[in-house]
UniProtKB/Swiss-Prot annotation:
Gene3D superfamilies in UniProt: Ribonuclease Inhibitor
Domain (LRRCT) ranges: 279-317
CC per GO annotation: centriolar satellite; cytosol; microtubule
Protein name per the record: Leucine-rich repeat-containing protein 49
Lineage of the organism: Eukaryota, Metazoa, Chordata, Craniata, Vertebrata
LRR repeats: 113-134, 135-156, 157-178, 179-200, 201-222, 223-244, 245-266
Annotated region described as Disordered, given as residue ranges: 311-332, 359-381
Length: 686
């Protein structure tokens, strides 16, 4: 806004139009015959007091086509302006030449006392012929065709210069205008702010609707209170914090995308009114809070007054945003740690599988060697042990041992899913989980864990997470149908997902039907995301029903009872007792019930023994055999020694008998001495 003292001057000019003004056009010789005199139209529109208000550029776009052709620059003459004495007396300090279709500035003689000069809405291309107006304070050249700022060096008293809507490309030739208070350059083609650092008294600078891409070089404008930069191409702002008196800054409709590009505004202590509307930054959800947080002294934002409630919210939101950032950073760290841990677990798993494959190959080679005493379970050579290192690849073994123990497993609860990575994660089932957490888990995922190790913790899983209904297996070495038997000990399974990666069992065509048959008491709903239908259950029974019957019929009764749990032993005994009854005696309902119980019992005989458990049993059998062998060997040795002693006795006995008889005869040959000897022995014994 222009100071009131200039506003009043322009107002008077608007109300007191110079209606008696004469223009005299003459050649350079100034001869009387070449003079042409004409009078300006008395209905000339008054000067509307146009200043640097924010609507200065409102009609800019609509006026672009209003220009008409310029007077040829080769024209040798300038219009000469002359006014009567009466007019000079009435309007001594102002002159309005608005909308006169002027292409050049006329020569103004005898008007050195002018303080206001208005050339609005003409076709002037160059500022000239006004250097003699050294008392001029207000110069309005709005809406002309000026391409360069010139001809102003002598106007040292000029306070208001309005050059809006011209063709100026560069700010220049303002060195002598040190008293300039208002400078309007809106609607031009300026690309850079320059040559204004000496304007220490400038209070209003309007550069709206130009081609500025950045704002800087504002040092020295110590009195600037208003800066209008609307409708440019500005991407960043600098040096605004060096303007100690700046109160209003208008940056609407530019290309500002972040607060960092205008961060210098936060350092300004004088700004009270600022606009960002029409910028990409104004579309962001954090825009208003960020601006208010960094510029607490603002009174208006985007032409709207800032309330105390908005300030309060702005002071709270940053704390929440900071907490969100910290939480986001924490989550990022956790995700990265999770990723690294999973990669480490996967690498360890891969090394284990390669070591196991090498061990398996070595075992096959050993089996092709000369016959040795053996008693093995199929697949029992999958596990690799440290003592076999001599036959394993040394590089793989050392790499496996080099992995950190703390990085080889991961336990994660995400919503309703418990994810376990690595065999060490199974130890989490020994923790004291809260009732709420344990009850929330419905899905358990096993990754990079041997299935045989999982089997050992299934009873704990059933107790710790009673609501687990969905099991996922990925990279768990599920290689045969028999392994699915181990899942029967769980309480309930509604869904089962077996990832093909690391589980060769899914390559079997009928594996899903076997799962449905063996785990029929669970009434599963989905397998690998596919709904289970009644036809699937019927097909599973047809394919594998005979298998359970054969398995149960081949087992002795004592083995059957040992396999069944206590809860099923009574059912099994009931079935055995019912075999002797006639079919007609038992009602149809009872028969169906027994048949159902029998089917479950038959399926129970299809169990799974882990390789580790089998190896333990195998070692136990070997120990028993060894004990029996040693015991028998000791008995044989003892019997042999007894026999040898008996044979030696038989050889020595005849001679010993003769000696005994001889000693007895000699001893009793003297009856008295023999009796004394006997009495003496009796006495000695007492």
């Amino acid at each position: 806004m222009i100071p009131g003292k200039y506003r009043s001057v322009s107002g008077r000019a608007a109300n007191n139009v110079n209606c008696g003004l004469h223009l005299v056009i003459q050649t350079s010789s100034l001869s009387d015959k070449n003079k042409v005199e004409f009078r300006l139209n008395r209905e000339t529109p008054p000067f509307p007091g146009r200043l640097l208000q924010h609507d200065l550029e409102r009609n800019y776009s609509s006026r672009q086509g209003d220009h008409i052709s310029l007077v040829s620059s080769s024209m040798p003459a300038f219009p000469i302006l002359q006014r009567s004495s009466e007019e000079k007396t009435l309007y001594s300090d102002r002159l309005t030449l608005e909308r006169q279709k002027l292409t050049v500035c006329p020569i103004i003689d005898g008007e050195e006392h002018l303080r206001l000069l208005n050339f609005q809405h003409n076709f002037i291309t160059r500022i000239q012929n006004i250097s003699n107006l050294q008392r001029l304070i207000f110069l309005d050249l709005y809406d002309n065709q000026i391409e360069e700022i010139s001809g102003l060096s002598t106007l040292k008293s000029l306070r208001v210069l309005l050059l809006g809507k011209n063709r100026i490309k560069k700010i220049s030739n303002l060195e002598n205008l040190k008293n300039l208070d208002v400078l309007d350059l809106h609607g031009n083609q300026i690309t850079k702010i320059e040559n204004v650092n000496h304007l220490c008294d400038l209070r209003v600078l309007n550069l709206a609707r130009n081609l500025l891409s950045h704002v800087d070089n504002l040092n020295g404008l110590d009195s600037l209170t208003e800066l209008n930069l609307r409708h440019n191409q500005i991407t960043f702002v600098r040096d605004v914090d060096n303007l100690p008196c700046l109160q209003r800054l208008f940056l609407s409709f530019n290309n500002i995308t972040s607060f960092e590009s205008v961060s210098c505004l936060a350092e300004s202590t004088s700004l009270s009114d600022i606009t960002f509307d029409g910028n990409p930054i104004a579309q962001e959800s954090w825009y208003k809070h960020t601006v208010l947080q960094n510029m607490m002294q603002l009174r208006q934002l985007d032409m709207k007054r800032i309330t105390e409630e908005e300030r309060r919210v702005a002071s709270v939101v940053p704390k929440k945003e900071e907490e969100k950032k910290r939480e986001s950073h924490k989550q990022s760290l956790l995700k990265e740690k999770k990723r690294l841990t999973i990669n480490n677990v996967a690498r360890k798993w891969d090394l284990q599988q390669r070591v196991a494959n090498i061990a398996s190959t070595q075992d096959r080679k050993d089996s092709e060697s000369p016959p040795q005493e053996s008693c093995q379970l199929d697949g029992g050579n999958i596990s690799a042990f440290p003592e076999e290192a001599g036959s394993l690849d040394a590089g793989l073994s050392s790499a496996l041992q080099g992995l950190s123990v703390t990085e080889t497993h991961l336990v994660e609860i995400d919503g309703e899913t418990l994810s376990l990575y690595g065999s060490g994660a199974l130890e989490c089932l020994d923790r004291n989980w809260s009732v709420q957490t344990a009850g929330m888990v419905t899905t358990v995922s096993f990754t990079f864990i041997e299935f045989d190790e999982i089997v050992q913790v299934l009873p704990k899983l059933k107790m710790k997470f009673p609501n687990s209904l969905h099991l996922k297996f990925r990279e768990t070495n599920l290689v045969m149908l028999q392994q699915f038997n181990a899942l029967a000990q769980l309480r309930r399974v509604d869904q089962l997902t077996i990832d093909p990666q690391g589980n060769p069992v899914v390559n079997f065509t009928l594996w899903k039907y076997y799962v449905l048959f063996r785990l029929s008491h669970f009434s599963m709903q989905k397998i690998n995301g596919t709904e289970v239908t009644q036809n699937d259950m019927i097909m599973a029974e047809r394919l594998f029903g005979i298998l359970a019957h054969v398995a149960s019929s081949e087992l002795p009764q004592y083995r059957m009872i040992s396999i069944l749990g206590d809860a099923r032993k009574k059912q099994f005994r009931y079935l055995l007792e019912s075999k002797g009854k006639k079919p007609g005696i038992i009602c149809e309902e009872t028969s169906d019930s027994k048949r159902f119980l029998g089917e479950n019992t038959n399926r129970a005989t299809l169990n799974y023994t882990t390789r580790e458990f089998y190896h333990e049993k195998l070692e136990e059998i070997k120990d028993k055999k060894k004990f029996c062998r040693l015991y028998v060997e000791d008995l044989v040795k003892e019997a042999t020694a007894i026999n040898m002693k008996n044979e030696a006795l038989q050889k020595l006995w005849p001679q010993m008998f003769i000696e005994l008889v001889r000693d007895a005869v000699i001893e009793i040959r003297s009856k008295d001495s023999y009796m004394k000897l006997c009495l003496q022995q009796i006495t000695d014994q007492k």
